Amino acid sequence: MATVTVKLDNLKKLKDAVSKQAQRTVKVGVDSGAFYPNGIAVAEIASYLNYGWTQTVKKQQSKWLGAHGVHMKVGATLNMPARPFFRAAIDAKKQDIAKVTEMAKAVLNNITENTPQKIQKALKLLGALGVEAVRDAINDGYAGNVSFALRSPATLVIYGNLFSGHKTDDTPNQITNRKPLRVEGTLAGSISFEIED
């Protein structure tokens, strides 16, 4: 009687590779190595923009603001409204994200020796989709049906003075765009993704 011996070594390797790829996650966010020219981390500013903040004006801030054309008394309240560009961007692209996720699930249902590479490709596609969504939200000032609060007149005065190179003179403001989240493109350019095990 003839016998057939089947070695399943490669099948186990494939199963392990597929299992490893299927457990990976995609994270979209601000590159931790990105900084503005003044040395402030882009991630720190992104957090303030995304979640907003409120604070009481201190003496030194009152002087600085006054020198830049915004006169606020000590004890006044500064408020920056939340502009939730991360959540709004991802919510606006939910259907596209769901399509890519379904494609990845279909790959898992038809395992071949290319499956790990296909899963990796799907993860990269999800990351690129997330980056594009967040960058678009930053550049456009809205995502889906969520529009972000416009810049305040005080912010325009400060930006106008800072970006025109003026410190305390009374020359006209050069920045008039009230669209939030974008001045020079640093924030949008620092959005990236990584795939984690």
Regions found by a protein language model. Give the residues of each.
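Short, Lys/Arg-rich flexible segments
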Residues: 1-197
